[in-house]
Amino acid sequence: MNLLSIGGSDPSSGAGIQSDIKTFSTLDVHGLTIITAITGQNTTNFGMVEPVSKEILQNQWEAIISDFKIDGIKIGMVYNSQIIKTLYQNLKKLKIPIIVDPVIKSTTGGMLIKESAITDFKKFIIPLATIITPNRFEAEILTKTKINSKNTPEKIAKMIQRMGAKLSLIHI
């Protein structure tokens, strides 16, 4: 089985494609990667983000898709609208499971998606999702609604599904 991780590179391997590769390996799955951005971070500090160009993103896609049968995709950090739209053009025709793990902020506080790209994320990436797995913070950002006794996680998950995801699982 071949799974493709699309996301950012975390040099500490605590998140991003490096973390996905570790998980895939544990499950005896062949992991493939497309890097959307390179981050400078570790377990305590966030430095910066350098997104890849549209050309290198497309080149990575063509290299993978021309050589491997992809059985599933996990999308993490997408960072900006150019990356989102390029991915959408490549992914929209595929008929394979896509897991979307929205990546908005690092655990050390760094922003991992441009605020201006959140609308495009909702328009182009969420509808591709077989399942989307936001945490509480990400779900609240995507829906612009605070989770509370009135707006339960179940209600917020339904709001996200109405954006196009087949399933939504919020981890609190």
Task: Please identify what each model-predicted range represents.
Residues 3-25:
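Glycine/serine-rich anion-binding loops at beta->alpha junctions
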Residues 12-19, 52-59, 68, 78-82, ...:
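Conserved active-site and cofactor/substrate-binding residues in soluble primary-metabolism enzymes
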Residues 21-22, 85, 123, 158:
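Alpha-helical segments flanking ligand/cofactor-binding loops in enzyme cores
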Residues 115-171:
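Conserved phosphate/ATP/ADP-binding segment of small-molecule kinases
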